[in-house]
Amino acid sequence: IDKAVDEAMQARAEGVKTIKLKGGVEQKRDIELIRGIREAIGPELNSCVDANQGYPTAKAAVKITKAMEKYDLLYMEQPVEGIDQMAEVTRRVDTPIMADESAWTPQDVIEIVQKKAADMISIYTTKPGGMFKAKKVAAVAEAAGLKCNVNGSVETGVGNAANLHLAASTGIVTYGCVVPVSTPKDKGKGGIAGIYYQDDVIVEPFVYSDGDIIVSPKPGLGIEIDEDKLKHYRIA
């Protein structure tokens, strides 16, 4: 918890506006984590929890989500497995519920809407099978009036560029997105938003300013690949 608080403080110092806390393993620890971070950073940052389907039952998820509500939780992401259980949690809490693992395809989102199983949708380029299919997921969510964010699968620069363009080109993406700041090792560090990487295969790092990643005006995804690094890191 102390390490998480330190990282939250660093995120605030670097201009990050929303932080996501990983939960779903130890329920008591999850409450202590959100409490500790809220006490440390005050009301300045949005805070959300991603349980990755970790709570064993809808009843448990409802209990822990309600316990977190006093700490101004922006949303709870995928607290339980399955759309039916998600619907039960959504009905019984005031905190908005985001669907992630339950929302892979446009058909999934239709079922979520029909069962009122979430208040918002997390979109990926990877889950549905690429940018075009991700835009279909977004279109269904938009038709249903559900806001979205874009999440990533810990991609390096090419995938992050795709996620960045998906977020920037999709009007219903209004919540903070999980897009790490990919940074080649000879270009410095990406700060708290680039901690996943020691290096990257893109030539230039993403431009990061006050918590935002700036979309490149260059053609395509706006990136250039370092061919030497691509060969170096290639798995034969």
Predicted regions: what they are:
Residues 35, 161-164, 219:
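A generic structural signal for well-ordered alpha-helical surface patches
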Residues 22-26, 53, 57, 77-79, ...:
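Glycine- and other small-residue-rich loops at beta-strand/loop junctions that grip anionic moieties
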Residues 1-93:
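Metal-dependent enolase-superfamily TIM-barrel catalytic cores that perform enediolate-based chemistry
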Residues 66, 72, 81-96, 104-210:
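Shared catalytic-loop signature of beta/alpha-barrel
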